[in-house]
Amino acid sequence: MDEASNAFEYIRTLELQHQKKKPTFSDLMDYLDIKARKEGIPLYGQFELTPLCNFDCKMCYTHLTREQMGDRELLSTEQWKKIIHDAWNAGMMSANLTGGECLTYPGFEEIYLYLRELGCEIVVLSNGALMDEKWIAFFQKHRPRMIQITLYGGDEETYYRVTGHRHFDKVIRHIKMAIEAKLPVAIAITPNKYMDEGIFQTIKLAKELGIYYNISGILTDPKEETGRSGQDHNLPVDGHVQILVYRNQLEGIETIPIPPEKLPPPGGPYHEWQGCGLTCKAGQSCFTVEWDGKLYACGSIREIWAEPVRIGFENAWNHVRQEALKYPVVPECIDCPYESVCTNCAAIKTQYAGKGRRPLLLCKQTQFLVQQGVMRIPDCR
């Protein structure tokens, strides 16, 4: 789509192209994101209020215990409010509150209400175990943009294998309470090897709940300090195929495999440096501030960070943005025939092959998913 001169033109173009009867707030944010990336405005912020959690998921990239935190302390509520205010002054319009489990942070309510006072849209990322009557009433009174609850299984045994706790019944009860309260709630599913066959019951349950659900792909490697890094928590690629075929069956979508000889080889025409810069929102229009006050372009790219508590938000954001613009692009990914379905995540590509290097195994896995008919690329049927 050619760049529109203003938001109204952008929305009209969407209506013409997709016959949308009622443009959404997300459509407006998409337009603002285009502008924000160009101008270097931090439109989206993610705030990891705490690394502490009431779950102990085997594949979690961030959860720490009190012992692992050592003598480090959580930021105070006032410190968070200062960072948030400065981010809002710099252009932030949307904030994700996460953890760990963000509802365990003592100042959650105050921070949440402060974001509301500033006029930011808020997404709450939670495991749902604490989302009881008290929190349901709170969010009814002060509605978020979305509450995203991660579902780790379809029964107590799967929950125990993944999270170390049998909280399945409690989480499902809380999700149903949120739905009954007409709160905007969505389900996230994170496939991993610990779910085993329980993944299919999890997807079926998410479908039966009748709300939006999303199935994520490749897991990013946990932070080294968690003690879970360097381990393979992912499903094999054929496991992802089975999951997506099952999802298609539930959604009434036909899965049509494609003969290998009809598929183009992965990789674009370039094999030498073509430029730099993260190709996602990270460091362009979004940022993450973690529990210890460090600001990252992306929490999965650990070498790009700054300290807004020490140098101020504006200086921290500008530093992170400049470093993000230097991040090497994989030349073979440019104009690759699988570009529209392959991950756009630089952290995952780096996880496969190192910075700026072609992730050959990821290329083969993406081609395999297209061959199996669970992903589709243009002009290939």
Residues covered by each model-derived region:
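Radical SAM enzyme [4Fe-4S]-AdoMet core and its adjacent flexible, acidic
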Residues: 2-11, 142-146, 150-296, 300-305
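Flexible mid-to-C-terminal extensions adjoining Fe-S/redox cofactors in radical SAM and related proteins
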Residues: 2-32, 41, 294, 299-381
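Conserved alpha-helical substructure of the radical SAM core
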Residues: 2-146
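Short Gly/Pro-enriched turn/cap motifs at secondary-structure boundaries
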Residues: 37, 275-280, 324-327
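Residue-level preference for beta-strand/loop junctions
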Residues: 41, 51, 280-281, 330
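Cysteine-centered iron-sulfur cluster-binding motifs in ferredoxin-type domains/subunits
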Residues: 48-56, 283-284, 333-340
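Short loop/turn motifs at secondary-structure junctions
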Residues: 56, 91, 143, 184, ...
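Short glycine-enriched, charge-decorated loop/helix-capping segments at active-site entrances
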Residues: 66-74, 161-167, 351-352
